[in-house]
């Protein structure tokens, strides 16, 4: 899904680091997967991969399945992880993460 943007080995390593339930940390994940060091254009491409329904926003149900965008068969985020991730990214309080909010979250 992230061919040409992220290395498979980086995706696998980032997933291994948050295998246990409630161990997901978006800052550590974005750093490990290599997204934090990417250009604004590449981060935008990543956003559109994660925005499964192409609504222009990443909603809670898409966040829950966030890890599966990086490696097929990865675990779903727990409710607590999903809510914390949404809260961190949703700076305008509309219940979803827009592309600019996502970029800010990746670079946080």
Swiss-Prot record:
Chain sites annotated for binding Ca(2+) 2: 90, 92, 94, 96, 101
Domain of life: Eukaryota
Sites bearing N-acetylalanine, chain numbering: 1
Gene3D superfamilies in alphabetical order: EF-hand
Keyword Repeat: yes
Binding of Ca(2+) 1, residues: 51, 53, 55, 57, 59, 62
Signal peptide (from-to): none
GO molecular function: calcium ion binding
Family to which this protein belongs: Belongs to the parvalbumin family.
Miscellaneous comment: Is regarded as an important allergen. On the 2D-gel the determined pI of this protein is: 4.05, its MW is: 11.35 kDa.
Protein name in UniProt: Parvalbumin beta 2
Gene source species: Macruronus magellanicus
Phylogenetic placement of the source organism: Eukaryota, Metazoa, Chordata, Craniata, Vertebrata
């Amino acid at each position: 899904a992230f061919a040409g943007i992220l290395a498979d080995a980086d995706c696998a390593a980032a997933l291994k680091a948050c295998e246990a339930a409630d161990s997901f940390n978006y800052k550590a994940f974005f750093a490990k997967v290599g997204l934090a060091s990417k250009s604004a254009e590449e981060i935008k491409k990543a956003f559109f991969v994660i925005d499964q329904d192409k609504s222009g926003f990443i909603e809670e149900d898409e966040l829950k399945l966030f890890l599966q965008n990086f490696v097929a068969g990865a675990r779903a985020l727990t409710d607590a992880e999903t809510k914390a991730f949404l809260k961190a990214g949703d700076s305008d309080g509309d219940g979803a993460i827009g592309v600019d909010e996502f970029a800010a979250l990746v670079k946080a």
